[in-house]
C-alpha cells in the first residue's frame, strides 16, 4: 500500500512538473507568435508606406515633366548662325541672343547673325 502511495505521489509530482514545463513552453510559443505577428505587421505597414511614397513621387515627377515639357524652348539658332530679323521663315535666335547685322563688311553683309546682346 505504501508503494502504491509513493508511486502515485511520484507520478503526481512528475505530472505537475511536466505540466508546468508545458505551460511555460506554451507561454514562450505565444510570445514568439506575438513577436512574429508584430514583425509581420510592421513589415506590411512599411510596404504600404513605401507604396504610398512611390505613388506620390510618381505624381510629382509627372507634374515636373509636364512643366518642363511646356516651358522648354523650341528650336532656335545658336550664336554665329544666320538668322532672319523677322523669324517667320528661319529659326529665331536662342534666348540671350539677338539677330543683328554684322559690324564688319564682307561676303556675309547681306545676312543677319545671332549675337549676344
Swiss-Prot record:
Compartment(s) where it occurs, according to its Swiss-Prot or TrEMBL record: Secreted
Residue ranges of the propeptide: 22-75
Keyword Metal-binding: no
GO cellular component: extracellular region
Keywords, sorted A to Z: Disulfide bond, Ion channel impairing toxin, Knottin, Secreted, Signal, Toxin
Record-linked InterPro entries: Toxin_22 (IPR012627)
Signal peptide region: 1-21
GO molecular function (one): toxin activity
Tissue: Expressed by the venom gland.
Keyword Amino-acid biosynthesis included in the entry's annotation: no
Residue pairs linked by disulfide bridges in the UniProt entry: 76-94, 83-99, 93-114
One Pfam family in the UniProt entry: Toxin_22
Purpose: Probable ion channel inhibitor.
Family from the record: Belongs to the neurotoxin 14 (magi-1) family. 01 (HNTX-16) subfamily.
Domains: entry comment: The presence of a 'disulfide through disulfide knot' structurally defines this protein as a knottin.
Protein name: U9-theraphotoxin-Hhn1a
Lineage, top ranks: Eukaryota, Metazoa, Ecdysozoa, Arthropoda, Chelicerata
